[in-house]
Amino acid sequence: MIENQTRTRQLTRAAQPLIHCITNPISIHDCANIILAAGGRPIMAEHPAEVAEITSHAQALALNLGNITDARMESMPKSLKTAGSIHIPVMLDLVGTACSTLRYEFAQKLMNIHMPELLKGNMSELLAMSGQTAHAIGIDAGTQDTLTDANRSHLLEIFQEKAAQWNTTLLITGKEDMVVSADKCTFIMRGTPAMSQITGTGCMLGMICATYLAVTDPFTAAVSAATEFGIAGEKAEKNSSGPGSFQVELFDQFYNLTQQDIF
């Protein structure tokens, strides 16, 4: 898997894939820049009249439900239909689906139009989408929705069943990340609490996933993205003195990651 991760980064930088992102204004700037740091080329078009055309030229589509608006709720289905019709891989970030009925129902609508190759969300969001009780605190996962040794097997069973039913891959984020498909799973313990002290790191992780989806399979894309971004966060914390310098350092550390860092 480590060899796959380093190869994913190499392939991405060689291909420079165009990634069409429809996301929220809170983190859009950072999302575009992290795609560049990963080796992709972002385009953030979201007008309903142009999104289908833009998606048709992209190598991957990233949809993020944060700060959802009527305009993006009109645009996302159009892009998703286009992606599905011409086999462009899709990452859907389920931001807020555990705390907002509007977003929960809209996510279900999107998944019925065309199932994204990768669904990303925190534990509360993925539990909610799986029909389980969730305890979200706003868009954050609730403390009751935490992966532990006691519930690990039970949660894995739930998510593998859903991955098989939906024919997709799940990235469930938290202190310990889970990447789950119908027939395999992995757990990733990387990153730092400092990453939760700036806005948009979850959105950025989704964009890295989408960028890697353009060159590799969903499982490898998710594992590579979560591992590399977590390592970058750990290195950034060592070289920063607070949230401001940490944010700048996070981009630099992610951009400059080497094969030795990942190993």
Locate each region found by the language model.
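Conserved N-terminal subdomain of the carbohydrate kinase-like
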Residues: I2-L92
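Short, small-residue-enriched loops and turns at beta-alpha junctions
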Residues: I68-A71, G96-S100, M178, M195
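Glycine/small-residue-rich loop that forms an oxyanion/phosphate-binding "nest" at active or ligand-binding sites
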Residues: R72-G121
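Conserved phosphate/ATP/ADP-binding segment of small-molecule kinases
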Residues: R103-C185
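Short, small-residue alpha-helix embedded
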Residues: A128, Q197-T227
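Short, well-structured alpha-helical segments that form the helix of a local strand-helix-strand
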Residues: I158-A163, P218-G233, L250-F251
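Short pre-catalytic strand/loop immediately N-terminal to key active-site residues, enriched for Gly-Thr
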Residues: I188-T199
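Charged C-terminal helix
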Residues: G230-F263
